[in-house]
């Protein structure tokens, strides 16, 4: 019997669901619906001043096994090539809205010495150990998946990986229990989490430690894909031999697994995977949907082509990357590219609210162009999160409920893998039958 599977969403979760489903069902028909005109989900790019600029999901980590393995399979190049924290020739700072409380070159030992001087060697060791232990627990999911373990719910994932404690306390509380100083939490922790999630160290310890590890504080190296991180997800869909329908919005799924699109067209499938947040997808489902009870966090991105007025920051020249404490008017700021056509650097802000022209005129001495975007990017990853089932209704599955515990491109890819395995168990896929 040839199965027909529908996937709603062509981001990390949707593309890896498709890729894994193809491994289970060599002859299945896999159709991916994506309401945008590009694949990649939050790893989105825009054309700005003649350059392709990534506006979200910009960094990957060497421990991201699913993405790293597929990138290697696809022959994708890294940019920059696998740098470790302390190897990048740039500068990074923490700004409190008035002054830089931390500032250092990220090149070589100078960065490490600056960290030790500000935060203390033993604090940094304890941070690295705590982040490393958490990531080691999370990374055990790969061997479990490869061994044929099927997860029916996010609760199953948390229990199998022994991450219950990390989901029940905040990063701040967890750090305190590990004797990591408040300064580390309020400057390093807050700076990175404000940049990554637009949130604070009061998020769950699991989400916080995943964020810190993703910034290099558990070892490993950071990188991006030369052609943009979305190239991995486009490659996953190609390897899945999926039919990808861009610009096609699904508005409903019936009890009989019939999909309805925005144009009124209908189509029947054997199973449907919603690879997008239930509460944001705008899809009427055959059962009361489970949602991320804590809601989603809005992120504003502002791209600016221009010349920075260093005096705004009290320095002759703005650093390459600026993280911030809660008293600052934006979450993070940094140079992300260079417009060859305009011969101007391109900068990116993350902020909680829209940054107006008046504010930008203070930061920049001259501005050629501005591009603003806003979206509900991440769930609010609170302590004691909802641990919902991946199965919404008979034949209807969802990947994004896992975002309640942590949310990165890799964890979404892992969720897609888990859901594909669940579908395979329910529909007798080849790998499921062999296990």
Question: What are these language model-derived features?
Answer:
Residues 22-48:
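Glycine-rich FAD pyrophosphate-binding loop
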Residues 209-257:
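Helical element adjacent to the flavin cofactor pocket in flavoenzyme catalytic cores
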Residues 332-435:
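Conserved flavin/dinucleotide-binding core of flavoenzymes
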Residues 72, 80-198:
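Mobile amphipathic helical/loop "lid" adjacent to a hydrophobic cofactor/ligand pocket
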Residues 13, 38, 279:
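Conserved Rossmann-like nucleotide-cofactor binding loop
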